[in-house]
Amino acid sequence: MNVDFIAGINNLGEKIYTCEPFKTSFQNPFIVALIITAVVLVVFFAICNPPVDKKRKTKTAIYIYICIVALLFLHYYVLNHQLNDIYNKSNMDVIVSSIHDKYKGGDEIIPPVSPPSVPDELEEDRPKMIPAGSKPADFKPAEPAVSKPLIPLQEVIMPSQYNN
């Protein structure tokens, strides 16, 4: 189907259920779907008569009603809302409006959270500069680190699985 045709149908439907006298009740999609369902059911049962048997007639009516309600909700929610959002707004407008609705901040700009500031190091904490080539009198070569035996990580996390 042509995109403009679908968007035109959706805009027409939107204009119909947002008329000023009916604006409060017809903006609720559930009420619109119920009204359309009732109209379709009346027309359906007027045109096509289900079987005469009472039990079969009731079952058929229930199945048809469930199918019609499911189709109407599918049409209303999927086609009307999503196609209007896709064809009447750009993706960026949708994203910006959803962010605006989520935070309700309006036009105020929220500054990004800055990382905690690190205080300046004190003079005695800074390493002293040693001129190249000279060694202080108290200089000692670094001692090798004493290494401990490593324990596998799996045994630390779940020792019961490996002891079996």
UniProtKB/Swiss-Prot annotation:
Query: Quick one: where is this thing mainly located?
Result: host cell
As given in the record, the signal peptide range reads none
Q: Which family does it belong to?
A: Belongs to the asfivirus B169L family.
List all annotated glycosylation positions: N88
Please give the start and end residues of each transmembrane region.
28-48, 60-80
* Subcellular compartments: Host membrane; Virion
Q: GO cellular component terms?
A: host cell membrane; membrane; virion component
Q: Tell me the protein's name.
A: Transmembrane protein B169L
**Does Lipid metabolism count among this protein's keywords?**
no
Q: How does it sit in the membrane?
A: Multi-pass membrane protein
Using the UniProt annotation, give all residue ranges assigned to the region (Disordered). Answer: 114-142
Q: Which UniProt keywords apply?
A: Glycoprotein, Host membrane, Late protein, Membrane, Transmembrane, Transmembrane helix, Virion
Organism whose genome encodes this protein: African swine fever virus (isolate Pig/Kenya/KEN-50/1950) (ASFV)
